[in-house]
Design a protein with these regions (language model features):
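A conserved acidic, glycine/proline-rich C-terminal tail/linker
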Residues: 325-329
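Short, well-ordered beta-strand elements
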Residues: 36, 339-341, 347-356
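Generic C-terminus detector
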Residues: 356-378
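Hydrophobic (often cysteine-bearing) scaffold residues that line and stabilize catalytic clefts
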Residues: 2, 6, 57, 61, ...
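Short, surface-exposed loop or secondary-structure junction motifs
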Residues: 35, 86-324
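Active-site SXXK
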Residues: 6-10, 24, 30, 56-84, ...
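Short glycine-rich, acidic/polar surface loops and turns
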Residues: 301, 311-313, 334-342
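Short, conserved catalytic-motif segment at the N-terminal edge
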Residues: 2-57, 96-102
C-alpha cells in the first residue's frame, strides 16, 4: 500500500476545515496495520494528532459487544433465542408503546413476544434511541427522564420483537446480558474475551486522567461551518455502555477489524465470524436513521441505492461499492463522526475517526468515502 494518497487527502481535509485533526488506520491484506494522523487534537488544543490520540468511538462499540456476546453463545453461556427477561427482569414483561392519550400520557400494551438476544443484536427488538425516535423522546419527556437516566431497560418497545428494524439501544442491553452471564462488569468481560487476546491495550470504558490527557477534543459544527469546542461526553452509565461507551484509537480498533477480516485472529471463533458476516434482516429490511435531535445527529442514509442487510452487529452491503469494498463487507459508525468498514473478501479494513457533532456530517462522510477509495486504489 502506498501511504501518500491517504496522507494527502487527510491533510487536505484538515486544511479545508473538515476537522482540526483526523486519525485513521488501514488493515492490509497481509494483516499489517498502517496508521495516519493529521492536524491537531482540537480547535483549542494545538497538540498534534498522533496514532496514540484517543477518541470516544460511541457506537463503534456495538460490533465489539456483539462479538463478545456471540463468543458467549458459542461457549454455551448465552442463547440467541432465550427470552432476555429470564436474566434481565426489566425486560421480563416488555410493553409496546401504541401512542399517547389526550393528556400526553403514554398508551402501552403488553408485548405478545419476548425480546431475545437475537433481536437485540440485530436492532429488531423494538427498542429505539431518543435521538432517532420522536415517540421514545416524547415518552422520556413525559416521565421527566432522559436516556441516561432511563437506560435501555426503562424504554417501551415501538413494535413487536422481530417485526421490523429500528436502530436503538438493543446492543446496549446486550451488554447488560453479558454482565449477567459472566458475573463481571462489561469492561472486564470484554477485556477477557476481546481486548486482551487481541492486544487492544488502548480501548476502555473507564479512561484514567493519564489516558484522557491523550484524548482528542469534541466539537460542534456551527451554522457557518466552523467547529467550536464543546465539553466531552462523560462516561456512559452501565445501561448504555455496550452500545456506545468505549474510547479507543484507530490503531486499536483496527486490531479488532483485522480479526474480523482475517479469520478471527485466533480469538473470534468460526461461529462468531459467521454471525458477524451473515445478514439477519433480509425479511424485514434495514431502515434509515431519521434524527429528531439535529444537534446530535443528521439523518443517516448509508450507501444509497445499495442492497443492504444487518448482521449480528454490522451493516452489510450486498452489492460491491464502485472503487471500494466488496459485496458482503461490514460497516458501522460512531456518533462523533467515527466511521469504519471491514471487507472479509479482500482482507482489507479501514477506520477514520473525527470528534464532532452532529453525526453524519457530510464533510466527514465525503472524506471517508475518498479514504476508502484511496485505500483500494493504492
Amino acid at each position: 500500500m502506498t501511504r501518500q494518497p491517504v496522507q494527502a487527502l487527510l491533510t487536505d481535509a484538515v486544511a479545508r476545515g473538515v476537522a482540526p485533526g483526523l486519525s485513521a488506520a488501514v488493515v492490509r491484506p497481509d494483516g499489517q496495520i498502517h496508521t495516519f494522523a493529521v492536524g491537531a487534537r482540537g480547535a483549542s488544543d494545538p497538540a498534534p494528532m498522533d496514532p496514540e490520540t484517543v477518541f470516544w468511538v460511541a457506537s463503534c462499540t456495538k460490533a465489539i459487544t456483539t462479538a463478545a456476546a456471540l463468543e458467549l453463545v458459542a461457549r454455551g453461556r448465552l442463547d440467541l433465542d432465550e427470552p432476555v427477561g429470564r436474566r434481565l427482569p426489566g425486560l421480563a414483561e416488555p410493553s409496546v408503546l401504541e401512542g399517547f392519550d389526550a393528556d400526553g400520557a403514554p398508551i402501552e400494551r403488553p408485548a405478545r413476544r419476548p425480546v431475545t438476544l437475537r433481536n437485540l443484536l440485530t436492532h429488531t427488538s423494538g427498542l429505539a434511541y431518543d435521538f432517532n425516535s420522536a415517540e421514545t423522546l416524547r415518552f422520556l419527556e413525559h416521565r421527566g427522564q432522559n436516556l441516561g437516566s432511563a437506560g435501555g431497560l426503562g424504554l417501551p418497545l415501538l413494535f413487536e420483537p422481530g417485526e421490523r428494524w429500528c436502530y436503538g439501544v438493543g446492543i446496549d442491553v446486550a451488554g447488560l446480558l453479558i454482565e449477567a452471564a459472566t458475573g463481571r462488569s462489561l469492561g472486564e468481560a470484554l477485556s477477557e474475551i476481546v481486548f486482551g487476546p487481541l492486544g487492544m491495550n488502548d480501548t476502555t470504558f473507564d479512561p484514567t486522567p493519564e489516558y484522557n490527557a491523550r484524548r482528542a477534543g469534541l466539537h460542534a459544527r456551527l451554522p457557518d461551518g466552523q467547529l467550536a469546542p464543546i465539553d466531552a461526553i462523560p462516561p456512559l452509565p452501565a445501561d448504555l455502555r455496550g452500545g456506545g461507551g468505549l474510547c479507543s484509537t484507530p490503531t486499536d480498533y483496527a486490531k479488532f477489524l483485522r480479526a474480523v477480516v482475517h479469520g478471527g485472529g485466533g480469538v473470534l471463533s468460526a461461529a462468531t465470524l459467521a454471525g458477524l458476516s451473515t445478514s439477519q434482516t433480509d425479511e424485514v429490511g434495514v431502515g434509515e436513521i431519521q434524527s429528531v435531535m439535529p444537534h446530535l445527529s443528521s439523518d443517516y442514509r448509508p450507501m444509497p441505492g445499495v442492497r443492504k442487510g444487518f448482521t449480528f452487529g454490522f451493516l452489510q452491503n450486498h452489492d460491491a461499492l464502485p472503487g471500494g469494498r466488496a459485496a458482503g463487507s461490514l460497516s458501522w459508525a460512531g456518533l462523533p463522526n467515527c466511521y469504519y468498514w471491514a471487507d472479509p473478501a479482500g482482507g482489507v479494513a479501514g477506520a477514520l475517526f473525527a470528534q464532532s457533532l452532529p453525526f453524519a456530517d457530510p464533510r466527514v462522510l465525503e472524506v471517508f468515502d475518498a479514504f476508502e477509495r484511496a485505500v483500494y486504489a493504492s
